C-alpha cells in the first residue's frame, strides 16, 4: 500500500479538503496507522477540553446572578427574575447571531486562528463579568462572551476532521461528554466560589468568573501550542476553487439537510426542557407531583445523572453505534424517552403515597435509564456529517445547526419551566400535564424520524481527513 507523506498545514490553508484525490467522495479508508490514530485522538482530547469552556462560561453565573443583580444593580426583588432571565439568555442570543459569520471566517482564516481567538475572547469576557458594578456592564460582558461563540462550531468540525469512520462515534461521544462536564462544573464553580470575602470583598462575584476564565486561558494556551491546523494546503485544489460557494440557502436545499436540522433541533429542545425542569421537579413537594428533595439530594441526583451520561457516552455508545447505526439508535432512544418519562411520573406517585422503598428503587433506575438519551445528541452529530453535501459545506452546516441550538437554549428553559410551574396550579393529576406534553413531543420526534435520510442510516461518511 502506498503511503502518502502528510501535508504541512498552516493557518492560511483551506479549511476543508477538496473532493479530488484519495477519498474524493468524502469517504475515508477505515485503515489508519496506529501512530496516526494515537495522534488524532490526542487532538480530539485537546479539542474536547476546548469544547467544555463554552458551557462552563455559560452556566457559571447561574447560581449567583439573581443575588448579583439585586446587590449590584439595586433591582427590586420582584423584578430580579426578569433581568436575570435576560442576562442569562443574552449569551445564547448573541452566539446565535454570529455563529455562521464565525464559520465563514474559519473558511477564510483556517480553523486554528478562529479557535484561539474565540477561546481567548470567551475566557477574558467571562472573567470580567464578575467585576460588573452596574446592570449595563453585566449586559455588556454577557453579550461580549456570546460574541466569541466560534469555539463550538470550530471544535465540532475539527473533531470530524481528526477522526475516521472507525473512530468518529467515539470522538463525538467525547465531544458530548465535554459539554456535560462543562455544564456540571460551571454551576459548581459559581455556587462554591461566590462571595468569598477577603481580597474579593469589593467584588464578591468575581472569583467564580475569574476561575472560569482561568480554565479558558489554560485551554487556550494548550490549543495554541499543541492543536494542529486541519485545513491543509494540499486539500485546496483548482477543482475546489472553481466550485460554487456553499451558501446557507444552497446547503438547506441539499438532500437530507432540512430533516436532520429539524430532528437535531427537536432533540435539543427535549434535552433543554428536561434539564431546565428537573431541578424544579426535584424540589417540588410530593403533594404537587415532585420528589420533594433537599438541595443535597438534588445535587446527588444531578451529579448521578452526569456520571450515568458519562458511562453511556464513553462505554456504551461507540460499540452500540457500530452494531446498530445512527438511525436505529435514534428510534430506540425515543422508546427509552417514553419509558423514562413514565417511570419518573410513577416514582412521583409512589413518593406521594409514601411507598418509599419502591420509590428509592424506581427513581434511581429511571435516572440511569433516562441518562442514556444523551446518546441521541451524539448520534445527531454524526447525522450532520452524513448529510453534508460537500466538505466545503461542513463548517456552515454545523454553524446553522449550532445557531438553532443557541436559539433554543435562549428560549426553551424559560418556556418549559413556566409551563411546568403553571401545571402545579392544577388539581391532581393535572400537575403531571408537563410530562404528558414532553411525551407528546417525543412521539412527534419518533414520527419525524421517518424522514431520516438514507445516508444517515448507513455507516458514517467522513468529510474531513483522509488516510492512505
Curated annotation (Swiss-Prot):
- Transmembrane annotation, as ranges: 43-65, 80-100, 112-132, 135-155, 174-194, 207-227, 257-277, 296-316, 329-349, 357-377, 387-407, 429-449
Q: Main location per UniProt?
A: membrane
Q: Which GO terms describe its cellular component?
A: plasma membrane
Induction (record text): Expression is under the control of the azaphilone cluster-specific transcription factor azaR.
Is Plastid one of the keywords UniProt gives this record?
Answer: no
Q: What are the start and end residues of every segment in region (Disordered)?
A: 1-30
Give membrane topology per the record: Multi-pass membrane protein
What SUPFAM superfamilies does this protein map onto? MFS general substrate transporter
Give the UniProt subcellular location, in the record's own words: Cell membrane
One Gene Ontology term of the molecular function aspect: transmembrane transporter activity
Glycosylated residues (UniProt): 228
| Heme listed as a keyword | no
| Keywords, alphabetical | Cell membrane, Glycoprotein, Membrane, Transmembrane, Transmembrane helix, Transport
The function of this protein is: Efflux pump that might be required for efficient secretion of azaphilones.
Record-stated family:
Belongs to the major facilitator superfamily.
Question: Which PANTHER family has this protein been placed in?
Answer: MAJOR FACILITATOR SUPERFAMILY (MFS) PROFILE DOMAIN-CONTAINING PROTEIN (PTHR23504:SF3), MAJOR FACILITATOR SUPERFAMILY DOMAIN-CONTAINING PROTEIN 10 (PTHR23504)
User: What is the protein name for this chain?
Assistant: Efflux pump azaK
Which organism is this entry from? Aspergillus niger (strain ATCC 1015 / CBS 113.46 / FGSC A1144 / LSHB Ac4 / NCTC 3858a / NRRL 328 / USDA 3528.7)
Gene, per the UniProt record: azaK
